[in-house]
């Protein structure tokens, strides 16, 4: 999955992404025995017994310094979806939607009041998915500057 995602993004933005090294990739991608806890979630989607996609998320606790922060969300538990991927053959078949909805339900059950994620701004697939399909709103911009 990481190889396919890396290849896709390397094609659309070769200066921002690269194809991951294949050696050791499978072992690095396998969830550990403690992948699902009260604060961490890994979901795997299958279609007709075949791997179709995955999602990784975590429950972020309220920040102790939230009263000093300008973002009110930081004072509450938040669901952070840090990885979502589906094989291209399963795009637009509801796999990613079901994964995100399951993660949101998991977060809600644990007290999360908001769900957050990040994605590549230049993606013609993920931006419409998150904004139009799932109802997420843009709230921040991540800036980057090479130092070497």
Role assignments for model-derived ranges:
Residues 44, 50-59, 80, 85:
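Conserved beta-strand in the GNAT
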